[in-house]
Amino acid sequence: MKLIIANRGAHDIGKTTAIKNVFANLYAKYAPTTTIYEPLNIADLAYNWVDVKATIKIGSTLVGIESQGDPGSRMQQSVDDFVAWGCEIILVACRNQGDTINTITNLESNHGYTVLWLQNGKCTDPACWQKLEEKYGNWIADIIEKCALTRTLSPTYL
């Protein structure tokens, strides 16, 4: 099974925050099988402007996580790295159009990945938005964990 989960959306909708929440959730369970490439100090993830690039081994499945998804970011290089390292599941942020979308569709057409396009919600109330991001991150982490452990993508996981 090869799966890429693309958290897409416009600038400042919370894509990076959601992916960092997914990472935190999975890291809490799988820290011994995690390799963090960015940032060099995990404590820096508490800052909004810091992105994460990491791999996590869940069962026998390697998962790649990249929270940078802006055009011109390291997203393309991270995806190339994840494919070269044998990641069967990749989670990335991306915009709604342009180079980041092209990177993902290339994985589908040239590397056999199934694409799961997702988009987090937004709320004008900050407390509501924070809770929404937390629940969304937990949901994605749950999908990743189930897919990794069963090595399948089932509609029941969604």
Where are each of the predicted segments found?
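Glycine-rich phosphate-binding P-loop
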Residues: 3-27
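Conserved nucleotide-sensing/catalytic segment adjacent to the nucleotide-binding pocket
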Residues: 31-95, 101
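Active-site catalytic pocket residues across diverse enzymes, especially alpha/beta-hydrolases
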Residues: 26, 30, 108
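Glycine/serine-rich loop-strand microenvironments at binding/catalytic pocket rims
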Residues: 1-4, 114-116
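Phosphate/oxyanion-binding active-site loops and adjacent basic polyanion-contact surfaces
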Residues: 15, 67-75, 132-140
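Short, glycine/charged-enriched secondary-structure capping and boundary segments
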Residues: 22, 80, 104-107
